[in-house]
Amino acid sequence: MDKNIKVSFKHVSKEYDLYQNKSDKIKGLFLPKSKRVQSFWALRNVCFDVYDGETVGLIGINGSGKSTISNIMSGVIPPTQGEVVINGETSLIAIAVGLKGPLSGLENIRLKLLMHGLKGSQIDSLLPSIIEFADIGDFINQPIKNYSSGMRSRLGFAISVHTDPDILVVDEALSVGDQTFYQKCVDKINEFKAQGKTIVFVSHSLGQVKSLCDKIIWMHHGEVREIGDAAEVAEKYDEFVKWFNKQPNDFKKKYQKEQKEKQKLPQEKIYPTPNANKYKMGLFDKCFLVVLLALLVLFGSLISTGKSFMGLFSATDNKVEQVTKVDKRTDWK
């Protein structure tokens, strides 16, 4: 029986504008696309499917687009082009993702569980297990802005694995922390694998990916370079890394610069996001929107001023009425 697709990326691209200052952001609202600031394509035409029960690894050098994929997959950011289909609830595990610095560890646990739709009684029943798994001692009652990266990773991992997600996205969350906690996380991931859950594992560690994953997606400067069996793709990636590291520094810098410049080139809309053009505003629409907002502000000011005048007249009427009553009482006497 064929497995169901849990995650599907079809011709997905992600563009960022490389703003240099605040005025560039304002220009970006009004100027045509061709006259805006320089763009950067973090992802370009990415296609892959992740099936039910698979554990898939995302590998690649820095800036290859791994975290961008995990953020799109988890709904943190939208794609610029293409179609993303997620069949199930996704939980992203990354260092400090979704954690609020001023809040304590305990408060963050409650907040994240509430955001996952859990009720008070359910949260209370999960708290002891999460606190025990995180194993950060008395720091659980301290603001997490005072936590080390390892402690934040521990807390984030502990919360996410206790929300019972359909799809677990682990983004470099095992790159910090000691070996004891790492093994605890690996055991939990293997437990999820045994339950048939879908796992996407993002890491620089080829050893971790090979030991945990069935399939590997090799990302290279925003594009898919290879997809296939974990052992085969890992071997090819390892060969590339060894070859690259042997090259002179001048060659490395030139190669990386060329790849970055390539990511700045214009992108053809191979697979537009459904209904994207329907909501795209032209220059006239943007100017109309600004004028409309200005009129609304002016109208609000006039209403506020009118209320002030009405209040003044009302106060005057009350005074006149009080004087009249006093005069009547005087006449009666």
Curated annotation (Swiss-Prot):
Keyword entries, A-Z: ATP-binding, Cell membrane, Membrane, Nucleotide-binding, Translocase, Transport
Reactions listed under catalytic activity: ATP + H2O + teichoic acidSide 1 = ADP + phosphate + teichoic acidSide 2
Task of the protein: Part of the ABC transporter complex TagGH involved in teichoic acids export. Responsible for energy coupling to the transport system.
Enzyme Commission designation: 7.5.2.4
Residues in ABC transporter domain copies: 26-246
Binding partners and assembly: The complex is composed of two ATP-binding proteins (TagH) and two transmembrane proteins (TagG).
Family per record: Belongs to the ABC transporter superfamily. Teichoic acids exporter (TC 3.A.1.104.1) family.
GO cellular component terms, semicolon-separated: plasma membrane
Pfam entry (one): ABC_tran
Binding locations of ATP: G60, I61, N62, G63, S64, G65, K66, S67
Name under which the protein is recorded: Teichoic acids export ATP-binding protein TagH
Subcellular location(s) of the protein: Cell membrane
SUPFAM superfamilies cross-referenced by the UniProt entry: P-loop containing nucleoside triphosphate hydrolases
Principal cellular location given in the protein's record: membrane
PROSITE patterns, A to Z: ABC_TRANSPORTER_1, ABC_TRANSPORTER_2, TAGH
Membrane topology, as annotated: Peripheral membrane protein
GO molecular function (one): ATP hydrolysis activity
